[in-house]
Amino acid sequence: MANTVYENFFLSNIVEDQFNSHLDLLPFCTVDNTLEGVAGMKRVINTYRATDGTEKLTVGEGNSKSIEVNYTPVEYVIALAQNRFEWFDEDAMKDPMLVPVGLKHGATDMYNTVQGDIYGEFAKTGLVVNATTPDFDAFVDASGALNLENIEDVKVFAFVCPKDKAKVRKALKDDLKYVEEYAKHGYIGTVAGINVYAKQDATEGEIVVATKEAVTIFTKKGVSTEQITEGNRSEDAANKRKNTAFSRKYYVVALTDESKAVKIKLTA
């Protein structure tokens, strides 16, 4: 498909926001740079789960069950995410905005793809806390469902979609505190030791609560780029004055510890 360029008249250039979400999820997961292999190769990753074991007892009673931890080997395929942007010399001469916008969107599109996979792994968790409203008790129950030995030493976070953000603020009121230490793009506040962030493309009606141990991204390196432009084009591309830019990333994203992620499911 050919690029759309503007004709030769005065134009105010407005570049639309192309990010699905500005909240970067890499700080919220474990990054492992030891990935080996090529696209299509399989990697087996153990996903850990823990069963509940808390019981309310009377005098003389003991627990009838214990917390049990087990794992399931899950097979993942190494992904190669790649995008391509093509333009002709004449396009750039006619519209100076075309190439910068196209190259920038190559990076943005890659970012959206990887970020979507990371959030998708968090959302796979089978631990669910049902709540009619996202109030203080709902977040406390979610925190309690996580397999945490010492919550004081662990950073717990939550992702909420913009449509549910107002519900969270309304339900929590003064229980939602603003802590400067955790302030970053999308930060709403902290409740029950959980830092709550708004994520533009999070699922409505579901609030993911987790620690960074829940999801791991296995990667070789960052995004690599390749440009085929004047001076290194093939004879055919040079003859047509055609340029091409590629962005690539090899990675696997996995829910490596399901006991470290829980969803608050709003049932109202």
Question: Where are the regions a protein language model picked out?
Answer:
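Short, ordered beta-strand-loop transition motifs
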Residues: A39, K199-E204, R233-R241
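N-terminal "assembly arms/tails" that initiate or stabilize quaternary assembly
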Residues: M1-T72
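Structural beta-strand/beta-sheet cores of well-ordered domains, especially the beta-sheet scaffolds
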Residues: M41-R43, N83, V154-V156, A192-I194, ...
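Extended, compositionally biased alpha-helical segments that mediate assembly or anchoring
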Residues: R233-A268
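Short helix/loop capping segments that flank catalytic or ligand/cofactor-binding pockets
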Residues: G53-K56, D95, K167-K170, A254-T256
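Extended oligomerization regions of viral-like shell subunits
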Residues: V140, L146-Q227
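Short acidic, glycine/tyrosine-flanked loop/strand segments centered on an H-E-D-like triad
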Residues: V69-M93
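Alpha-helical scaffold segments that mediate packing/assembly in large oligomeric complexes
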Residues: E86-D153, K263-A268
